[in-house]
């Protein structure tokens, strides 16, 4: 997984160099570069953060570099700015099971997520 400060080509070159040092061969089976970072100064970011503040008052939020493989790359051709945000407050159990066996979200988290999307859609009419 690649990130903005070190893209696919640079990362693969470093991996090949390190592998060569130890007499190892490398083969890339599949690779794609990182998806475009969200514009945290743009209108989309402001709408999402305003809605977070409205639905989850007092909740802190912050942009960060997401190294996970998200669907954002699939939307780049039709969307200039893809905000990656899940309106769910995960508990310790959900964090431990993320992408694992029996991954789940507590039903208690769902009303907040529904409220968030209702407000986001309502605020953007």
Question: Can you name each region flagged by the protein language model?
Answer:
Residues 1-118, 122-125:
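Metal-dependent amide/peptide-bond hydrolase catalytic core
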